Regions:
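Bacterial N-terminal signal peptides
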Residues: 9-20
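Short beta-strand elements bearing conserved aromatic residues within extracellular beta-rich modules
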Residues: 59, 461, 533-535, 580
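Pro/Thr/Ser/Gly-rich low-complexity, intrinsically disordered linker/stalk tracts
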Residues: 505-530, 590-617
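Aromatic- and carboxylate-lined catalytic core of secreted/periplasmic carbohydrate-active enzymes
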Residues: 28, 45-48, 151, 359, ...
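Recognizes extended acidic, P/S/T-rich segments that occur
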Residues: 534-575
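Beta-strand-rich modules
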Residues: 531-532, 571-592
Length: 617
């Protein structure tokens, strides 16, 4: 791992930002959404007549963040501003990812909208889960998701739930105009009861999931795809905010399958994408999928066009993907696809799902979200499928059963440090993931006995069983690393998971998720067994010239600091730079390592740093 760096004024500054919104001059918290409201000189009718405000008016804000970053933000027509079609209201939304004063200037060829400007103060913390920031792909763990503050997250959803009442067969129809507000409230409460954190929702659907009657979601005014139904969009955004405030990711899908999208012009498709991004992407909890089963309505080149177009109107860098028919993800190397949204054999057994998920994960070093692989029946079969997919190193699991206990397991076990390691299972029916030489998790789909190769580990490992049916942990004693060990499930032929980890008295593992939060400060991920942290700073030019850390270390910024944040008020000289490294410290076992064990790291980092008189003691 290359140490995180902070450069002088002439060079690049690497950081993560924080965002918020304000209203009537009040400061908005970090990661909230600010809304700029402008009024045109002319009144427009969004439902009929000319000119059509959705096709004839363009509004762009140039937004400057407190640290100087500049964003081009698309505005949108919003009728009377409250869901009515007739009015002079145009809006633009700003994702405030950094405390301080944000400024904006408008440009438009439409009278009343051009040359306006303002400022938005941002301070404080957004309540709830998204105080951690939006879901991103952390540089330190590129195959998994995390929040912007470095906290790892396994996305869990129940997109299909055929055991539920008809109105709750799927989350996709959540925005349908056929549902009442109370029905939507009941559906969200039901999702909370499952302890999932992600809902897949259509922005357009005509015929999908209509077995109990039509469940359309129409973003347009009737069949006129040049005009948007502003009352419907007000519902979309209101519930998107509600999901955010209640800790739920809104994974928004522009187009459903089985809905005639193949007959739409590309201009109509792109218009929906642009309008949807303008209205919804500034909310911290949003992610996007262009279409379900793209092969039914798009060519491969049209998918590429749509993905690139979406990213051109994605100033807040929301994650996006596309969903195909069962099989391999078709666009693993596309720059617009931030993650791979998968459909694998929905009627296959769990081992088929596991192998398919592994094959897809190997396509690219980006998150693989196994979305569609089970019908969601609350059965042992669906549960085993979900765990088998998770043990293929998936960053998200979109269906399955007993998901509350998979969520509990993922919150406890640092899965983001692990990779699939089925080769560690010498014999027996089991799957394995490992942080090589440190810790292992093993899943027994049918219980039984498995022989596991622990030759990469040394010393004693604590062993704990986890019951996927009840969420209960139980001790399996200790085992010794350095060889093969046999494990037998305590629940006969029922599925069980096993966690093998260093004893709690061991030194903490490497610190991950180091990310700048401004020009002078940076955070890092919570690290198992660390009760405090040491942070060292060094001179980048000296490290490059002498190729050793000892002479390059110039400060211990924190020694046994108890938070996960460090500030450095010293600015490098122009053309120069600093590097930073963090290690966890255990109250009982002492300090961990400044190294994270990447293959590209040369050995000796810790003793070299320790030999410097400027290093932390």
């Amino acid at each position: 791992m290359t140490p995180p760096t902070r450069m002088g004024p002439a060079l690049l500054l690497l950081f993560f930002a924080c965002i918020s919104w304000s209203l009537a001059g009040a400061a908005a918290p970090v990661y909230d959404t600010a809304e700029v409201v402008l009024h045109s000189a002319q009144t427009f009718d969004g439902n009929s007549g000319t000119p059509n405000p959705f096709t004839s008016v363009t509004l762009t804000l140039t937004v400057v963040a407190p640290d100087g970053r500049t964003f081009q933000v698309d505005g949108f027509f919003d009728g009377n501003g409250a869901g009515g079609a007739v009015g002079d209201v145009f809006k633009a939304r700003i994702f405030l990812d950094q405390p301080g004063t944000w400024s904006w200037t408008s440009s438009s060829a439409t009278s009343g909208l051009d040359g306006r400007s303002g400022q938005i103060p941002c301070s404080g913390t957004l309540p709830g889960l998204f105080a951690k920031g939006p879901v991103v792909v952390p540089a330190a763990t590129p195959r998994y998701f995390g929040h912007a503050d470095g906290t790892p997250v396994l996305l869990l959803g129940k997109m299909l739930d055929f055991d539920a009442p008809p109105a709750q067969f799927t989350t996709f129809t959540f925005f349908s105009e056929t549902f009442s507000e109370s029905e939507r409230r009941a559906e969200l409460d039901y999702q909370h009861s499952l302890r999932v954190n992600t809902m897949a929702i259509y922005l357009f659907n005509q015929n999908d999931f209509n077995d109990d009657g039509p469940r359309p979601t129409n973003p347009w005014v009737g069949g006129d795809r040049t005009r948007f139904d502003l009352a419907h969009w007000r519902t979309f955004e209101t519930w998107t905010r509600t999901l955010r405030d209640e800790g739920m990711v809104a994974q928004l899908w522009f187009f459903a399958d089985d809905s005639g999208v193949g007959g739409f012009s590309m201009a109509d498709r792109l218009r929906l994408i642009r309008y949807g991004m303008a209205r919804l992407s500034a909310y911290a909890n949003t992610m996007f999928v262009t279409t379900l089963e793209w092969e039914e309505a798009f060519t491969a080149s049209e998918v590429d066009q749509a993905g690139q177009y979406l990213q051109s109107f994605n100033p807040w860098r929301r994650l996006t993907s596309v969903h195909g028919l069962p099989g391999l993800f078709d666009f693993p190397n596309a720059s617009w696809a931030n993650y791979m949204d998968l459909q694998i054999g929905i009627l296959d057994d769990w081992d088929g799902n596991h192998q398919d998920a592994l094959e897809n994960r190997a396509l690219a070093a980006k998150p693989s979200f196994c979305q569609e692989f089970a019908q969601g029946y609350e059965s042992g079969f669906s549960r085993i499928k979900a765990w088998s997919v998770f043990f293929a190193g998936q960053a998200g699991v979109g269906s399955g059963a007993y998901l509350a206990w998979l969520a509990e397991f993922a919150r406890t076990v640092p899965f983001q440090r692990m990779a699939p390691a089925d080769s560690r299972v010498v014999s027996g029916d089991a799957y394995c993931m490992a942080e090589s030489g440190v810790q292992y998790v093993v899943y027994f789909p049918l219980g039984g006995t498995a022989l596991v190769d622990l030759s990469g580990a040394s010393g004693t490992l604590d062993a704990q069983w986890f019951d996927p049916r009840t969420g209960q942990w139980s001790s399996a004693g200790t085992v010794s690393g350095g060889g093969t060990v046999s494990f037998t499930s305590p629940q006969g032929d029922d599925d069980m998971a096993l966690w093998l980890r260093p004893p709690s008295g061991s030194a903490p593992p490497p610190v991950l998720g180091v990310a700048f939060t401004g020009r002078t400060g940076f955070d890092w991920s919570d690290t198992r067994d660390a009760t405090s942290y040491d942070v060292v700073r060094g001179d980048l030019a000296v490290l490059r010239a002498q190729r050793t850390f000892t002479p390059a270390v110039n400060a211990c910024l924190e020694n046994n600091g108890t938070d996960r944040h460090a500030e450095d008020p010293v600015t490098p000289a122009s053309g120069q730079g600093f590097w930073y490294l963090v290690r966890g410290v255990s109250a009982s076992a002492g300090p961990g390592s400044y190294s994270i064990g990447d293959a590209g790291e040369r050995p000796g980092r810790d003793p070299e740093i320790g030999a410097s008189s400027a290093a932390c003691p």
